[in-house]
Amino acid sequence: MTVENHLNKIMEKLLDHFPKQFVTVEQLIHSIDLTLLDEHATTEALAQLKQDAQQNQVAALCIYLQHLPEIMPQNSISTATVINFPQGMEPLDVSLTAIEKAALLGVTEIDYVLPYSLYLAGQTQKALQQCHAIAQLCKQHKLALKVILESGTFPSIQAIYTISRELIDLECDFIKTSTGKIAQGASISDAVAILSAIKDANASCGIKISGGIKKPQQAFHYAVLAELMIDKPINKNWFRIGASSLLGELLKTH
């Protein structure tokens, strides 16, 4: 058992002791990026997603680029799409072109996968240069940028802290844990590392928790942790949870 595993277990026990009113169900719902990343999603499923998002005023919708025409236009709900997803191995020009297309379709947020294989293979500068180019284009189009680490591939929480500090220096808007497409999704220790980087940098960067967040109790744990570490109430401007089924589970608790 690793140190991170021990940390996850003890932190979950500690977070369980916080009263439920510390973070409300409504706060959690308004922090959700309601996600449907199924290449074969039907028109009916996308219409239901849009309806659920608008009825419950989630933070954003997150879907594949090819499904945007069926969702747009949106009104009060932000719309995100994924780029360089899920393996983080697209050529940079392909990602840049996709962002240009998304901007034309009216997207307001980009969830971009860090070229983590490059980064972890020692080509850190090349990976960060690609992120810098993405960040500059997003800034040009006034798009919020969430960079997905795929935190389950990193060897330690110190490594997650280091990459988070580097991405904060590139002025990304959120650091996101996982694509949700590998076995290891988000963990409490990963979130501690990212939140520590945000706090130490005194940055306006936010955090997005994603990868296996299905139960209200999980969402509550991460929200409480974020509030304790950043010392302010959660809201969609700096705290998000990416999930497909969490909204339905939270609504059952009302």
Language-model features, listed with the residues they occupy:
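Glycine-rich phosphate-binding active-site loops on the catalytic face of alpha/beta enzymes
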Residues: 81, 85, 105-118, 169-187, ...
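Hydrophobic faces of well-ordered beta-strands that scaffold small-molecule active sites
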Residues: 27-36, 59-63, 78-84, 110-112, ...
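Active-site cofactor/substrate anionic-group-binding motifs, chiefly glycine-
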Residues: 58-109
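Catalytic cores of alpha/beta
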Residues: 90-104, 155-166, 189-192, 199, ...
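Alpha-helix-loop-beta-strand connector modules within alpha/beta enzyme cores
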Residues: 65-87, 124-146, 169-170, 186-214
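Alpha/beta catalytic cores of nucleotide-metabolism and tRNA/nucleoside-modifying enzymes
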Residues: 1-40, 44, 192-205, 214-254
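Active-site mouth loops of central-metabolism enzymes
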Residues: 26-43, 80-96, 117-123, 146-159, ...
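Conserved anion-binding
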Residues: 99, 109-172
